[in-house]
Regions:
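Proteins that catalyze or organize thiol-disulfide redox chemistry
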Residues: 1-51, 58-92
Length: 92
């Protein structure tokens, strides 16, 4: 299951018991739309093992600024409340 990540709830999910994968995207971003089905499948396949979230950078620019996101899509990986990885661009 995918969750909606916002400025208000990212800390809660980051500090949860499961690792967190966050897809930062925007509605106007073509590459973001290309990877959306992959992110959804990841959420389905690893349900209960990781939390997969989507964060619209237009609505949550504070999240993008905090993690220095300059290009989208960007995927952030968190474990134990810490950022442990970052991937910028569409996955090929």
């Amino acid at each position: 299951m995918e969750v909606k990540i916002t400025t208000e709830n990212i800390e809660e999910y980051k500090n949860g018991s499961l690792p967190l994968v966050v897809d930062l995207w925007a509605t106007w971003c073509g590459p973001c739309r290309m990877i959306a089905p992959i992110v959804s499948k990841l959420a389905e396949e690893y349900d209960g093992k990781i939390v997969v979230g989507k964060c619209d950078v237009e609505e949550n620019d504070d999240v993008a600024a905090e993690y220095r996101v300059r290009n989208i899509p960007t995927i952030l990986f968190f474990k134990g409340g810490e950022l442990v990885g970052k991937h910028v661009g569409a996955i090929t």
